[in-house]
C-alpha cells in the first residue's frame, strides 16, 4: 500500500504534465481555417460545344437613376422639402409600401454594415452618402483587422474588464471578417522587435494570451525569433541592441474596397444605395417625431444642372456619419450635447523596399508612449499612426509635423544604412477617428475604440464610435435597437438574390429574419480562390501582377473586370491597359467602377475603387487624364463636365511627395500645367 501511495504522486504529476504538454502541442499545431484556401463555390468559366469561351455572368446592381427614383417614390406626391409635415396624411406617399423601414445616413463601414444587416433581415432599407462610400475615415485606416493587442495589455495591467471585452469581441469579429470577404482580407504576421532579454518573457506571455483568447478564431500561434532569424525575416531592422523578436498574427484588409463591397452587396440584396446625395435637413411629423429627410443630388450640380431636392420617407432614421455624427444630431436638436471626440490619425506611404512583402512590424513604445505600425500593403509600405485631438473637417490633411514624427520614429528601429527621407514619402493621409467622449479621459489615445448607440426623443438613432474590425457587431446592435425603437417587423428572405451568379447563393447564411451577417458572403467572395488569378491569365492573357491584383480586389468579379478591359494589340499581355505604369490597375477597373459600383467622379475611382491615390500621389496625378477620359465615355460627359471634374478633383491622400509640392489639395492649375490639358 505504501509503495502504491509513493508511486501515485509521481504518476499523477507525470500524467498532468503530459496532458498539459499534449494540449499545448494540439493548440499550436491544430488545423486552421485559412480564408481563400477552400475550393471556390463558383467554378471557372467553361467553353460551349462549339468551343466558344463563356465567362461567368453575374447580377448587376440597379442603376443610380433607378435607385433615386425609389427614394423619390418614398416621399410620394408631397416629395418637395418642407421642413415639417403638417399631418401624417400629407406626408404619406400614394403607396405605403414605398416608405422605407430604415433610412441610413452615411455609407462608411458602419452605415454600409447597417444597410446589409437590415436588408438581410427582410427590412426595406435606403442608405445615402454625401460623398462616396468610404470617402471619410473608412478609407484611411491602418488596413488592419485586429483584436487590439495593446488593449489586452491595458486590460491586464489596469484590470479593466471593458478593455478585455473589447479584445474578445474584436477577435471574434476578425474571424467573421476574413470568412465573409476572403478576397479582401488575409492574415499578416507582425514582428515585435526586442532590445532587452527581460522583455522576451513579458511580451511572450502577452502574445500567448492573445493566441489563447483568439482560440479557434486564430490562424497560427505566436512564436519567438532569435536575433539572426529576426534579421533574416526583416533585414531592414537595426542590429544594435536587438536580442530577438516575437511574431504574432493579425488580419489585414483593403478598407475602401471592403466598404464598397458591403454597399454593393446590400444593393444586390435589395437596399436602395445612393452616393453623392446630401442630407440637408430632417423631417418631422406633427408630433415632433422624425419621419424623413430632405436630400440634394450633388451629381446634378456637377453636371451643370440645378440640384434635385426631395424628401425620403422612412419609419426610422439611423445616423452613421462617423466624425460628422454631431452635425446630423444638431439637425434634430440644435442644443444637443456633442458625443464625439475627434482624433487625427496620420499615415505615410513609403516604397515597398522599406519592409518585407509578407511581414509587418509594431513598435509598442514610441518616444511619446504610443504605438506605431510598419506594414506591407499593395506593394508599398504603410507607417503610422498618430493620435491627437483634432477639429472635424471634410478633407483633413496630413501636416508636416505629423509626417516628420512618423519618419523619425521608424528611423529608430531601421538600420542606419537606410536613410529615411522625406522625399521617399509617396503619399500621406489623415483620417479622423470618431471616438466616443469619456469625460474622465485625459487624452484620446486612452479612449477605448468602443461604440455607443443613442436614440433621441424625436427618434434619431445614432451609432457612433467603434473601429473597422467591429463594424459588423456595431451594425447588428444598431439594427436590433432600430427594430425595437421603431417597432419594425423583420421577416425571412425567401427569394435571396443570386449574388454568386450561379444560383449558388447558399453560402451558409439562413436569412430567417435574424442577424446573419456573420455568414453572408460579400460580392466577389463566392467564386474566389487562391488560384483564381491563374484562370484569369489563361483565359484573358493579363499580366501576372494584374491578375493577382484583380482577384484580391474583386474576387470572382475579376472575370467581369478583365472582360471590360481593352485588347492591347500585343502578344502579351493580351488585355488590360494600365492606368499607371508603376501599379497593376487597368482600364477595365474604371469601367467596372462606373457600371457596377456607382463611381461618379475620378476621385471615386482613384482613391476608393482602386487605391492609386493612397499608394502614390504622383502616379495618381499622372493617371488622372486617362481616368477622366474613360469615365467621360461611360457617363457621357461633355467638355464642360470634364472641366468641372478637373477643377473639383482632389487627389486623396491630399499630400504629394516633396519633389512635387507640399501644398494640398491639388489645384487645377497644377493639373493643367502638368499635362497641358
Ranges and model annotations:
Residues 2-101, 120:
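Extreme N-terminal leader/targeting segments of oxidoreductases
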Residues 111-112:
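N-terminal Rossmann-fold NAD(P) dinucleotide-binding loop
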